[in-house]
Amino acid sequence: MSVEEKLNQAKGSIKEGVGKAIGDEKMEKEGAAEKVVSKVKEVAEDAKDAVEGAVEGVKNMLSGDDK
């Protein structure tokens, strides 16, 4: 989980909320898009970490280092 992506999600939420509050539809949509992009990046990072962990586990099993 990336702290940077969590911060970007929060920034997007704030931007979306401000846009909604002041009636700026463009700002609202930009904020919503930033939130989604950051969430996708976070999920991709988590998946990458999981795959790397699984690969490392398989390597250890094959080399006998899993003990």
From Swiss-Prot:
Pfam families in alphabetical order: CsbD
InterPro entries attached to this UniProt entry: CsbD, UPF0337_stress_rsp, YjbJ_sf
Disordered: annotated segments: 1-30
Highest taxon, organism lineage: Bacteria
Family label: Belongs to the UPF0337 (CsbD) family.
Alphabetical list of PANTHER family matching this protein: UPF0337 PROTEIN YJBJ
Name of the molecule in the record: UPF0337 protein spr1626
Gene source species: Streptococcus pneumoniae (strain ATCC BAA-255 / R6)
